[in-house]
Amino acid sequence: MAQLTRDALRNMNRPLAAAEVLVLGASYREDVGDTRYSGSELIVRRLSEMGAELRVHDPYVPHWWEFEKQDEYPSPKHSLKRFFRGQEKLAKLRIEQDLKKALCEVDAVIFAVRHQPYLDLDPDEVVETTGGPIAVIDCFGILNDAKIKRYFELGCEVKGLGRGHVKRIKDEVREEREQMYLQMNKKAHVRVRGS
């Protein structure tokens, strides 16, 4: 996921280093509040190692002890911190409970856990809240094709694990835009000639 995030940002001519990245979901599975053995922990640790600035939102998790107490949790010398460089700043990572606040001015959003509130997110509202086009990463098929298409229409870059058809959707959106511009230019040319 960290590499997909890097690639999506790169496609938008933005570096991952110092990018504000929001991870949606900290728990190990949907609609529960347990972070033990969460795949999101590995995503956060790898992104931190790559230089990203991180935010996390999870409606079911008030504290992420694997980070807040990373030197002693689950026990001394057994934290996943030991496998990654530059993990010290993650001890200050806190889970944001307010989704709108978490989305504000981020460069990338990673849909990491299939929580019900994330399934209901509207792409237009997400992009408006973030302040413009973002990189959108789908870890578990959370986004349907209509939402993926809408993110592309809004100028976002979308990547997904096991979502090979995303490129086809992107190409369709690009083709629709090109057709629209051709029609607009044709109408403008006709108006100019008719004057």
Predicted regions and their residues:
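Structural/interface elements that position substrates and couple domains in central-metabolism enzymes
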Residues: M1-S195
